[in-house]
Amino acid sequence: MSEKIDQIVEDLKTLTLLEASELVTKIEETFGVDASAAASGGVVMAAAPAVVEEVEEKTEFNLMLDEVPADKKIAVLKVVRSLTGLGLKEAKELVESAPKQIQEGLGKDAAEEAKKQIEAAGGKASLT
C-alpha cells in the first residue's frame, strides 16, 4: 500500500463512533453512494457459503421432581400418585427422595401438563 493510504487507515483507527458515523454520512453525500447497500451486500456474500445446521426438536421428555416443600408434601403426593399410578407407600417414598425422576419418555404436551400439575400443588419440577 502507499504511504498515503497507510496514513488514512491510521487516522481512521483513532475516530470515535460518532466521528465515524459522521464520516460515513459525509462520504455518502459527497460521492452519492449508499454505504448501507454495500455493507448488506458484503454480509450476504460472506454469509452465503455458511452451512445451515438443522436443529432437532426434542420429542421425548423425562419428568423430574426437583423439590417438595414440607408444607406441600401431601398435595404433591396426590399429584404424583395420579400421574404414576403408584400406591401410597411408593409415591410417598418417591416424593421424599426428591430430586427424583417421576416419569420418562413423555410427549411434549403430556410432560408440560404433568409439570404444571406438580407446580400447582406446590412442588418444583423440571423436564429433561
From Swiss-Prot:
Q: Which GO terms describe its molecular function?
A: mRNA binding; structural constituent of ribosome
Q: Report the locations given in the UniProt record.
A: Plastid, Chloroplast
Q: What Pfam family is a match, any one?
A: Ribosomal_L12_N
Q: Which GO terms describe its biological process?
A: translation
Question: Listed GO cellular component terms?
Answer: chloroplast; cytosolic large ribosomal subunit
Gene3D superfamilies noted in UniProt: 3.30.1390.10, Single helix bin (1.20.5.710)
Q: Per the record's keyword annotation, is Ribonucleoprotein included, yes or no?
A: yes
Keyword annotations: Chloroplast, Plastid, Ribonucleoprotein, Ribosomal protein
**Could you name the domain of life of the organism this protein comes from?**
Eukaryota
Q: Which NCBIfam families match?
A: L12
Entry similarity comment: Belongs to the bacterial ribosomal protein bL12 family.
Tell me, in a sentence or two, what this protein's role is: Forms part of the ribosomal stalk which helps the ribosome interact with GTP-bound translation factors. Is thus essential for accurate translation.
Designated name of the protein: Large ribosomal subunit protein bL12c
Organism (species): Phaeodactylum tricornutum (strain CCAP 1055/1)
